[in-house]
């Protein structure tokens, strides 16, 4: 069974693929099966993924308010996906902000650029303080 961290990795991958224009319905099913994400974990993955997409405008507004000199479109696609997932979980789920931020930092270390960890930490921490 996949861990919640592996689920979040998959959500970031799906958000990235969606932004790159992949045919998502077929891709997501194949991708999740390949990652052995099934049953409750698949449901959790799709809940997070669809939650981000359904609330994308609100999430992007929250992110824009805390990006400082950056614009969301100037940030790398992987980092943007991590930020969107983190902001969604902080704003729309009952998961503790500290857990969400820690997971986002782990994802940034694994998937993002070298400088993204501190940036993602700062943005999500600022959002958590407003929420």
Curated annotation (Swiss-Prot):
Keywords: RNA-binding, Transcription, Transcription antitermination, Transcription regulation. Pfam families: NusB. GO terms for molecular function: RNA binding. Gene3D superfamilies: NusB-like. GO terms for biological process: DNA-templated transcription termination; transcription antitermination. InterPro entries: NusB-like_sf, NusB_fam, NusB_RsmB_TIM44. One of its GO terms (cellular component) is cytosol. Involved in transcription antitermination. Required for transcription of ribosomal RNA (rRNA) genes. Binds specifically to the boxA antiterminator sequence of the ribosomal RNA (rrn) operons. Belongs to the NusB family. This is Transcription antitermination protein NusB. The lineage of its organism: Bacteria, Pseudomonadati, Campylobacterota, Epsilonproteobacteria, Campylobacterales. The gene is nusB.
């Amino acid at each position: 069974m996949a861990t919640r961290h592996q689920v979040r990795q998959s959500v970031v991958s799906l958000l990235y693929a969606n932004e790159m224009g992949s045919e998502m319905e077929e891709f997501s099913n194949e991708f999740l099966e390949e990652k052995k994400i099934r049953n409750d974990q698949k449901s959790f993955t799709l809940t997070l993924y669809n939650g981000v997409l359904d609330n994308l405008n609100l999430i992007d507004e929250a992110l824009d308010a805390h990006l400082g000199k950056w614009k969301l479109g100037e940030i790398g696609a992987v980092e943007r996906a991590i930020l969107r997932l983190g902001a969604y979980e902080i704003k729309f789920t009952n998961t503790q902000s500290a857990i969400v931020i820690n997971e986002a930092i782990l994802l940034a270390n694994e998937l993002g650029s070298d400088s993204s960890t501190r940036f993602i930490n700062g943005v999500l921490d600022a959002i958590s303080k407003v929420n």
